[in-house]
Structures are given as C-alpha cells and as structure tokens.
From Swiss-Prot:
Protein name: 2,3-bisphosphoglycerate-independent phosphoglycerate mutase
HAMAP family in alphabetical order: GpmI
Residue positions of the active site: 64
Enzyme class, broadest EC rank: isomerase
Species in which this protein is naturally found: Shewanella loihica (strain ATCC BAA-1088 / PV-4)
Cofactor note: Binds 2 manganese ions per subunit.
Protein family (similarity comment): Belongs to the BPG-independent phosphoglycerate mutase family.
Binding site for Mn(2+) 2: 14, 64, 444-445
Length: 514
C-alpha cells in the first residue's frame, strides 16, 4: 500500500509576466477570476526572471530554457556569454589554465598565438569583448606574434557593420605594440554547420597558409573592397592581410590557435579540421602540430583543451528529492515537456529515481492562435488525476499557452489563452485542497503581457524582461520582496521541511506564520 502524500505543486505559467502598462496586455485584459481571487486571498509577490538574475546579460529578456534551469537548480546559472564576461571582469580569464598553457607553450617555442572567432558584438556565437581580452592576455604574457583571424558576422548584427569592430582592433593592436589582424572571412565559410566542407576548407587554407582570394595591407581596406564586390559581412571572401613587408601569417608547428566562439553548433566543423587525426572533410595541404583551445566544449568527442567546461549542476531540486526518497511528477505539453524534464534537471536527460513524467501532445495546428487553449484541458485532467492519487510529494507542471500564443502576436488569441489557463488553475487548486496539498504559481518569463511594440505599432512576438508573478496557495505566511527564479527550489524544500543543499545559492523567500 502506498503512503498518502500531501503534494506540493509548482505551476509554471509560461510567458506570463506582469506589466504596469495595460495597453495590448493580454494578461491584464483576460478574464481571470481564479487568479484574481488567489491574489486577494494568498501571499503573492513579483519575482525576476530575466537579465543578471538568471545569469543573462543585464537587461536581456529571459527565456524558457534559462528559466527552467534556474528554477530547477535553485541557483543563478550563468550563461556562457555572461559567465565569460564575468570572468574577464574578475580577472580570472587571464589565469585560465587552458589559455595560459597554450600561450606559454607558443612563447617558449618562439611560436605565434593565433586567435580566431566571430568578430561581432552580437553575443550569440561570440562576443568581441572576449576576443579583445584574449589578445590583451597573450601580449601581457609575452607573446611577440599575435594574429587575429576574424570571421565576420552580418546575421546577428546588421549586414554591413563590421567596420567599427575592425577599426577597434586595429587601434587595440597599435596600443599593445604588437599583433595584427591577419585575415578576414565571412561566417558563411568559416562557421558552416551543414557539412559543406568546400566552404570550411577556404577558412582552413586562409588560416594555415595565408592562402586567399584577395590580398590587402589593411583589414578595413579589405572590408571596403568586399563591399565593392557586393559582399556583405557574412559572405566576405577569403582575404589575407599582409604585414608591412607584404608577408602573410601562417599557422606553424608549436603555434597556439585559440577559438573564441562559445556556441558549439557552428564551431564544430572548423575545429575538427584542425584537431581530428582522422579528419576527411577535405584534403588538407598542411597539418601543423599546434596547441588548440576551445573556448567551450563544442562536442564530447573533440579532443582539445576547453577553457570553460560546462558546469555540472549537482543537487538540483530533482536530485535532492531523489536522495531524500521523495516522489515527483513532471507534466506538460509537447512544447514545454523538455523544459520540465531536461532543463529543469540541469541538462540531464534521464529521470531521477522516483520521478515520473507525463507528456500531453500539443495540438497539431499551424499556429497556436488557432487553438489558444492548446491541450490545457487534457493536461489538467491528468494533473488532477495525479494530485488525487496522492502518490507524489512534488509535482512540476508547465502551462505553455501564454508563451506559445504570445509568440503569434495575436492579442485576442493571447487573451483566450490566459483565460483557458485560469480556468485550469481553478481545477488544480480545488484538487489540491481536497488532499491537503499546496502550490506555488509562477512563470519563467514574460510574453503575453506585451502584444504590441510601442515604438513601431507592430505585433510584439518576443519575450519580455518584466517581473513574473508568484502566489503561494497554502499555509499562512508572507513572501519576501526581490525574489528571483533561483529562489523557488530552496523555498519548496523549506516548505517541505527538507534541508537546502549548499550548492543552491537561492534562498527560501516564504516565511510561514504558523
């Protein structure tokens, strides 16, 4: 016979933010009697789900992946862009063992330090501030030859916007007294991810041999010439930049080659061409024995030092519940199933012991504004059934409607989506009351509360940086101000009378008064 549980549920209303401005605010205009009542009768607050509070750059809107990682891990998990930027600020970057080892070996062998990456402020695959820090660090350690191989963007930045970056690096090298931009090529070639090896080979030959379609004495001159050929940044053909004596830079034995992209998908192919012993993507004229460094791990089977290995998240909420012999359920529709499982568990695919999962198929419609309620009724049927079974200590549920319908930009549909979720919450709260359970109602980030762009008047389909709600439907108590998503797991453990592990840097923000 199974022991009867008093479940604690976490209901995540995806894309449901709070916004003072009520214009085209679907959350405000929706008829939500259940949430209105709960807000009057139970402790509630607003918490942060964006920017630095979830490990993103300041002001950056939150997203579902980041939100669920922060909620499930009970700590602020710094995303790569922020994590590396923070290490530069803290001074840790300059003593990073992978960088130090490669640079020092090159210097000792009288070799060169080559730095390659997407020279862009885009922040999607790389950030030029990281590349700048790497150039400074190499020179500070005594490198006499520093060569920058610049991949140009034009996708995550305007199509012709590289000139400012190139000018800034020309100035940087002048200040440092050594180093130069050695080559330019569009990301179309260097960062292919579809096994179009003919493209990658052009970048490889450019970096290793200085072999290029075009030869120039200055990077800005090279860019201007590319624009003259009607090549936008992304498509700039291979261009080698010579030194004052007309010599091109080449990659030789004992040189260091440091790849400054942090996003893996478009970094893998060119990396394999430099480090895989059995590489067969294209015929390589030269294969210098170099000290290669990946900024982050691009793939588990690429054998090269990694400057910033992925952080293994231990003692996430799911793991703590497992270790304490508790049972848990994860439930959502297809659209957010990975979020309440894989992302909530800190990037681990396998369920924990005692963790059950229920997947409800999202409706097969072209866009969700055609069915704004999505599969919320069926999801709630299964959720209520699970609550009534009293077999779970903790239930994690995500309602995707606010986000998925918010992305369509259809205001009327977003209002209907919010109303559908409100009705479902009424059923869930009622079921919990019958078994003496309680719940936290929150969101991972905003979306549906802003359905129009105030500047352009066009539909606003993106996430927002607004605060998100938190309601505690349970015992008497109060919620501390200034909470964030990483506080939810410690709060849940505290409500259950469980010890919060030291790895969780969030805090319990609910104080019970009974």
């Amino acid at each position: 016979m199974t022991t009867r549980k008093r479940p604690l549920a976490l209901l995540i209303l995806d894309g449901w933010g709070y916004r003072e401005n009520t214009h085209m605010n679907a959350v405000y205009h929706a008829n939500t009697p259940v949430l209105d009542r709960l807000n009057k009768e139970y402790p509630n607050s607003l918490i942060s789900g964006s920017g630095l509070d979830v490990g993103l750059p300041d002001g950056q809107m939150g997203n579902s992946e980041v939100g669920h990682i922060n909620i499930g891990s009970g700590r602020v998990v710094y995303q790569e862009l922020t994590r590396i930027g923070k290490s530069i600020e803290d001074g840790e970057f300059d003593s990073n063992p992978a960088f130090v080892d490669a640079v020092d070996k090159a210097i000792a062998a009288d070799g060169a330090v080559h730095i390659m990456g997407l020279l862009s402020p885009g922040g999607v695959h790389s950030h030029e501030s990281h590349i700048q820090a790497m150039c400074k660090m190499a020179v500070a350690r005594g490198a006499k030859q520093v060569y920058l191989h610049a991949f140009l963007d034009g996708r995550d930045t305007p199509p012709r916007s590289a000139k400012g970056s190139l000018q800034a690096f020309n100035e940087l090298f002048a200040e440092l007294g050594t180093g130069r931009i050695a080559s330019l090529i569009g990301r179309y070639y260097a960062m292919d991810r579809d096994n179009r090896w003919d493209r990658v080979s052009q970048a490889y030959e450019l970096i290793t041999q200085g072999k290029a379609l075009h030869l120039y004495q200055d990077a800005v001159e090279a860019l201007d010439a590319a624009y003259g050929r009607d090549e936008n940044d992304e498509f700039v053909a291979s261009s080698a930049i010579t030194d004052a004596d007309g010599q091109v830079a080449t990659l030789n034995d004992n040189d260091a080659l440091i790849f400054m992209n942090f996003r893996a998908d478009r970094a893998r192919q060119i990396t394999r061409s430099f480090v895989d012993p059995g590489f067969d993507g294209f015929e390589r004229a030269v294969t210098p024995k170099i000290n290669f460094v990946m900024l982050t791990e691009y793939a588990a089977d690429i054998k090269a030092p990694v400057a910033y290995p992925s952080v293994d998240l231990v003692n996430t909420l799911g793991e703590v519940l497992q270790n304490n012999g508790k049972t848990q359920l994860r439930i959502s529709e297809t659209e957010k199933y990975a979020h309440v499982t894989f992302f909530f568990n800190g990037g681990k695919e396998e369920p924990f012991e005692g963790e059950d999962r229920i997947l409800i198929q999202s409706p097969k419609v072209a866009t969700y504004d055609l069915q704004p309620e999505m599969s919320s009724t069926e999801l709630t049927d299964k959720l209520v059934e699970a609550i009534e079974s009293t077999q779970y200590d903790v239930i994690i549920c995500n309602y995707p409607n606010g986000d998925m319908v918010g992305h369509t930009g259809n205001f009327d549909a977003a209002v209907k989506a919010c109303e559908a979720v409100d009705a479902c919450i009424g059923r869930v709260v009622e079921a919990l009351a019958k078994v003496d359970g309680e719940c936290l109602i929150t969101a991972d980030h905003g979306n549906a509360e802003q359905m129009t762009d105030e500047q352009t008047g066009q539909a606003h389909t993106a996430h927002t940086s607004e605060l998100v709600p938190l309601i505690y439907v349970g015992r008497k108590g109060e919620i501390a101000p200034n909470g964030r998503l990483s506080d939810l797991a410690p709060t849940m453990l505290t409500l259950m009378g469980q010890t919060v592990p030291s790895e969780m840097t969030g805090h319990s923000i609910i104080t019970l008064s009974e």
